[in-house]
């Protein structure tokens, strides 16, 4: 078992990790991947041993976040150890951590030699980051930012699917953080979010979101028309 139900705690018990990997790979007929961190504590990083053992167990690919459990999301991701892992094992390695722009994506791929990248927090409220990165890696050029109308339609579509999946009560509440991510840095967004948090039904929530974006559209359809602050894409609070 894991203290506090945190899987990263398993990194303190390499024998248990090995037994779990062996058991899962043996139990299923589909490829098994592993996502983990550099280790549990700074200064005691054991990812090289864990990665090698994962390969021996038959893990199909390794996704590696460039921090320890101790780091949480503090400090910066350490790509050097991801590079060392890539040099050590022969299964695909997926680099993860602090990738928040097309330029950063290219840097991480080039520096680590990773086979792919994984994006987490930077995609919150910005799902188009994937097409931006793919376009940049292919052409070396930047895509234009989505306009306000597109952001509105993407968000409303996201909410519709979220409501359908989670239902009325949970859907309304889970959606709040997503709406906050999409609207962070936009004009009057603080006031909008405070009002949005008070809404208790999915229908009303979608309505206030649509109304807010319609107000923004009255000022212009470009993101630059309505952005009022620099947004840290990795700030989830």
Tell me what each language-model feature is:
Residues 9, 38-40, 70, 93-94:
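A generic structural signal for short
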Residues 19-22, 27-29, 43-61, 73, ...:
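Alpha/beta catalytic cores of nucleotide-metabolism and tRNA/nucleoside-modifying enzymes
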């Amino acid at each position: 078992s894991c203290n506090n139900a945190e899987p990263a705690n398993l990194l303190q018990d390499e024998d248990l990790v090995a037994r779990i990997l062996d058991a899962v790979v043996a139990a299923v007929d589909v490829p098994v991947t592993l996502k983990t961190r550099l280790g549990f504590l700074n200064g005691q990083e054991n990812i090289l041993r864990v990665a090698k053992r994962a390969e021996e167990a038959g893990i199909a690919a390794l996704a590696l976040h460039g921090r320890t459990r101790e780091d949480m999301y503090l400090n910066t991701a350490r790509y050097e150890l991801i590079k060392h892992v890539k040099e050590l094992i022969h299964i695909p390695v997926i680099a993860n951590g602090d990738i928040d722009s097309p330029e950063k994506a290219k840097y991480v791929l080039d520096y680590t030699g990773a086979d792919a990248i994984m994006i987490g927090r930077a995609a919150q409220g910005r799902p188009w980051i994937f097409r931006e990165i793919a376009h940049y890696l292919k052409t070396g050029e930047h895509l234009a930012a989505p306009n306000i109308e597109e952001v509105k339609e993407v968000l409303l579509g996201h909410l519709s699917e979220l409501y359908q999946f989670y239902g009325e009560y949970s859907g309304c509440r889970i959606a709040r953080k997503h709406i906050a991510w999409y609207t962070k840095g936009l004009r009057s967004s603080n006031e909008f979010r405070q009002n949005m948090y008070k809404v208790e039904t999915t229908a009303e929530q979608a309505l206030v979101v649509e109304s807010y974006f319609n107000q923004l559209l009255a000022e212009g359809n470009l993101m630059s028309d309505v952005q009022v602050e620099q947004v840290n894409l990795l700030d989830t609070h």
